[in-house]
Curated annotation (Swiss-Prot):
Keyword Coiled coil (UniProt): yes
Signal sequence segment: 1-17
Protein name (database record): Protein disulfide-isomerase-like protein EhSep2
Organism this protein belongs to: Emiliania huxleyi
Stored SUPFAM superfamilies: Thioredoxin-like
Protein keywords: Coiled coil, Endoplasmic reticulum, Selenocysteine, Signal
Residue window of motif Prevents secretion from ER: 220-223
Keyword Magnesium: no
Length: 223
């Protein structure tokens, strides 16, 4: 198992000059089963923002290269990583997600994207989270909730999980629909504004030309 992990790491590292490149072939091994937290940038090589961010992201990867707690990685959504981008709902580039064990769903990173901000987040927020095997990482409130969920019937626990996931998915869908509606309204308003500018500009120019300039104080009319 250790040899397999080392092989996967070497192969992945060779595919990227900085961060390790993830694909469906190594994602489970390096992220979900590694016990590490993962900080992952989903990208497209042609994306301007991705190119701009690459030096800082690669520097971040170098900083955590030997870390036993945090993995810094890339997923190329245009090649072998495309199935992962689809699985985790990536719709724009770059999208940054983080996985704190035992979380397998991933969370969207919404912080700043400078090297200092990324490094601070990785140092302070990433690491193994609260779980049955890591009770020392749990707050008293988390321990109470965890016990409640452990004592719950498996069917009830599954039902509760699916309900929460559906509520979240429905909320995201509603948000996206509203966003599309707002974008359409914005475009319609912008089109009207541009048309008005186009129609008004020549009239305004002629009206200004037809309006005599104000006389300077003390000036006399020429005879």
């Amino acid at each position: 198992m250790a040899l397999r992990s080392l092989t996967l790491l070497c192969a992945a590292a060779g595919a990227s000059a900085g961060a390790i490149e993830l694909t469906p072939d190594n994602f489970d091994e390096l992220v979900l089963k590694s016990g590490k937290a993962a900080f992952i940038k989903f990208l497209a090589p042609w994306u301007g923002h991705c190119k701009k961010m690459k030096p800082d992201w690669d520097s971040l990867a170098s900083t955590f290269e030997d870390s036993k707690k945090v993995l810094i990685a890339d997923v190329d959504c245009t090649t072998g990583g495309k199935p992962l981008c689809e699985k985790y709902g990536v719709r724009g580039y770059p999208t940054i997600k983080y996985f704190n064990p035992p979380d397998e769903e991933g969370e969207d990173y919404k912080g700043g994207r400078s090297l200092d901000e990324l490094k601070k987040f990785a140092e302070n927020e990433l690491g193994p989270g609260c779980s049955v095997d890591l009770m020392d990482n749990c707050s008293e409130e988390q321990k109470g909730k965890l016990k409640e969920y452990i004592d719950m019937a498996p069917e009830k626990r599954t039902e509760m999980l699916e309900t929460l996931k559906k509520e979240l998915a429905d909320a995201e869908s509603t948000h996206e629909a509203l966003l599309k509606e707002l974008q359409a309204t914005y475009k319609e308003s912008m089109d009207k504004l541009e048309k008005l500018k186009e129609e008004s500009a020549p009239k305004i120019k002629l009206l200004k030309a037809a309006t005599p300039a104000p006389k300077a104080e003390g000036a006399k009319d020429e005879v």
